[in-house]
Amino acid sequence: MPQGQLFFKTKNTSKQWVDAYTEYGMSLEDGAIGEIITPAPMKEGVSNSLATADGVAYMAGTIGKKNERTLSFNIHILAATEAAGWTAYRKFCREVLDPQYVQMKIVDGTEPFPTYLNNGVETAGALHLLFRSCQQVGRYRMRLLKWTLTFAEPNPSVRDNREPSIMN
């Protein structure tokens, strides 16, 4: 994934979008985009299954709601030297993972993901994620670092660029 395709924004990046490739030498591994663009699961609606009636009755307004989802995908950092690999890794952890709350977006060709409807117009948005864990997959003399990141997306219906409310 070359420059201009994967972006992060956190309080440690001065709330500005940062190009992952330019800043950290980071790219998504094969299969990562498929994991990221997979639709969120739906919540089970509130229902009542009475023995005296056929079928199941669902309470109005309780169906069609998205559930929290977990995203796990592989990334890698490619650096010119071992020292540059360590520097990029530490900078990524400090700027993107340490704040825990992360916004992420992808631009694949000219198509942004995610998008949302803004007054009927499809508009580029952002995934609002909470960092959960990082599992090291492998390294080659610190020039090529590969690992798996896991995030929670608490509310997949929020895809606009505003700051979501987080409970205190």
Model-predicted regions and their roles:
Residues 1-168:
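Extracellular/virion structural assembly segments
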